């Protein structure tokens, strides 16, 4: 359990540090971090390797559901216009959804029963909906049949009724 001081000050001075009992067991306390080393000695290189992602990405949620007739992808893309979104299926069967300014990108390997030439996409409010048809001739996976004689033994439970 760790305790966090609550005060009006933003940072604690070194003398105000709270003692953490597990700090003594931390073997990586003096271990140099490559990110800190790069940012201190090579600031331009560290910006390329560790880009600031706070305002340059879209905070999105994506859902993939499978219905009996199609695969449906729904992505919440706040602040993204319909003209900025690109959705396509490549020759390897991957569905790629991205924005033109690369603030969002996601790839999905479509199953073999997906008809990659029958893909439709549209925007509803801030939601992108991608609809990929399924092959109707492919049957759903068969569940194993349950045997009627399963070697079941009935055990009588006896005891004292108090």
Curated annotation (Swiss-Prot):
GO biological process, one term: response to oxidative stress
GO cellular component: cytoplasm
Localization annotation: Cytoplasm
Membrane spanning residue stretches: none
Record keywords, A-Z: Cytoplasm, Stress response
The keyword Membrane is assigned to this record: no
Claim: Cytoplasm is one of the keywords in the record: yes
sHSP domain sequence ranges: 53-149
Subunit structure: May form oligomeric structures.
Family according to the record: Belongs to the small heat shock protein (HSP20) family.
Name the record gives this protein: 18.5 kDa class IV heat shock protein
Species this protein is from: Arabidopsis thaliana (Mouse-ear cress)
Gene: HSP18.5
